[in-house]
Regions:
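ASCE RecA-like P-loop NTPase motor cores
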Residues: 1-478
Length: 478
């Protein structure tokens, strides 16, 4: 996590505390005029100053992927991307399992920590703020946490897994399945990146180990495993069976109705969430009350949200014919109002001249790129040093970058461990640029924050490197 040291430095600058104080004014603070990397650094630093978890709301899922890749470099205990679907919530088919499982991976962490203990960061689109989830208490009741040393009845565990939608198979290959061989249970929770092998002695859970589904070889030991339902369908079906609404016969065909009454979960349960619960929840209902909420590019987010709301409103009127309550979509103005109930601020890449009563211009600038022209780069770094600007070098090959700069009488130092705080502090006090190693596919480019006296130079400026990232959502697996 190479940018941890930069975030720590920003936390220590008095200006960060002053900006944080401005965010507590009645008018919501807008930080403008900074690249995505600068916005991510400042959002992380301000949240860490508060000791608060962070939710970043962005306009699109593509942008969310870019933000998540950046925030992973900044030292958060966990960084999660919360995926959402662009489709209408009243479609007869549920969203793809990849999206549902990605959501459950985030929610299992929030539910298990019971809110206040969670200290991670989540990136989501404004669609996550629309009602699309069961109430937190309902999901929490249905989640299982198996801990090492616990006493567990294997027959009861099998019944619980079947109730949550897990399929019993002979060999584990994908999420949502489990198998048993004597006192060994293999399980692939939909909220996990790897399956888990549970080894019992009688009813005592002796060992929990992750394993590779391709080779079936055991990997690292773990202390606990969180098991969520395989989707929201089983929860909706349970709620509907407890209180059968009159219009259910018109919404489900005879076969689906028979499945539901027999205890199974037919396809397309998500659209019935408004019948199962009077008011479905959004991601906001799962967050701790002290979470810092950051809205990136408000105008774009509201435009996307309004377009989706119009589509959902039309689809509800055309397809459902008044049989379903309109509880799975709400106007974007209501969504933003719910977001603003949390502490936080807005971010914008471009400086706007709309006379906003509480805006702060970050005046961030790009660093000129001189690919493979280390004489020019050395001169640029020396100029920064004369201005008492703290210079950070972030590279996949930092030793090479340091050696090439040294040929032009520009002394920099590579710190192999980004957590070596004393060494980094000593170099900063000596006004020596600090080089750190990075890896991954985050889209990061050089930036300057003049007000914080900070400059970051990356492989884009050193070698002309450009990172290409996927535009869609791909759930992370190890």
């Amino acid at each position: 996590m190479p940018l941890t040291a930069l975030v720590r430095q920003l936390q220590q600058v008095p200006l960060t505390g002053e900006v944080l104080e401005r965010s507590r004014r009645p008018d919501r603070l807008r930080l403008q005029g900074a690249s995505r990397g600068a916005r991510a650094l400042l959002a992380s630093a301000m949240a860490r100053c508060e000791g608060a978890p962070l939710l970043v709301v962005v306009p699109t899922l593509e942008e969310a992927g870019r933000w998540a890749a950046l925030l992973e470099l900044m030292g958060w205990p966990t960084t999660q991307l919360y995926p959402t679907s662009e489709g209408s919530p009243y479609e007869a088919f549920d969203p793809t399992s990849e999206i549902t499982w990605g959501q459950l991976q985030v929610l299992s962490e929030l539910v298990d920590e019971q809110g206040d203990g969670w200290q991670g960061v989540i990136v989501a689109t404004e669609r996550a703020l629309q009602p699309h989830l069961p109430p937190p208490a309902v999901l929490a009741d249905q989640c299982l946490t198996l801990r090492k040393g616990a006493s567990i009845d294997l027959e009861e565990l099998a019944a619980n897994l079947a109730r949550l939608g897990y399929e019993r198979v002979s060999t584990i290959e994908q999420e949502g399945s489990w198998s048993r061989r004597g006192d060994i249970v293999d399980l692939f929770p939909v909220s996990a990146e790897l399956p888990v092998r549970l080894e019992f002695f009688g009813e005592d859970l002796e060992k929990l180990r992750e394993f590779d589904p391709a080779t079936q070889r055991s990997l690292d030991a773990v202390d606990l495993v969180r098991i969520t339902p395989t989707g929201y369908g089983p929860l909706v079906a349970d709620a509907l069976r407890a209180n059968l609404p009159d219009q259910l016969d018109q919404l489900l065909n005879a076969e689906a109705m028979e499945q539901l009454l027999a205890g199974d979960t037919p396809e397309g349960m998500r659209r019935l969430m408004g019948l199962a619960w009077q008011q479905p929840s959004s991601l906001l209902d799962y967050l701790p009350g002290h979470t810092l909420l950051v809205l990136d590019e408000r105008r774009q987010a509201m435009a996307h949200g309004q377009q989706w709301f119009d589509h959902a409103e039309q689809h509800h009127g055309d397809e459902v014919d008044g049989l379903l309550p309109p509880t799975l979509h709400r106007p974007i103005s209501d969504t933003i109002e719910a977001l603003e109930a949390f502490a936080g601020f807005d971010l914008a890449e471009l400086a706007e001249t709309d006379q906003h009563p509480n805006s702060f211009d970050l005046n961030s600038r790009a660093v000129p790129a001189y690919p493979n022209q280390f004489g020019k780069l050395a001169g640029l770094i020396k100029d920064f040093q004369r201005e008492k600007t703290r210079v950070w070098l972030l590279s996949a090959q930092p030793s090479r970058a340091v050696a090439l700069l040294e040929e032009h009488d520009c002394i920099t130092r590579f710190v192999p461990n980004p957590g070596d705080q004393p060494a980094i502090e000593r170099l900063i006090e000596q006004n020596t640029p600090v080089a750190l190693k990075t890896k991954g596919t985050a889209e990061l480019e050089g930036l300057q924050l003049p007000a914080w006296r900070l400059a970051l130079i990356t492989d884009r400026e050193f070698f002309g490197q450009q990172n290409l990232t996927a535009s869609g959502y791909v759930r992370r697996r190890r």
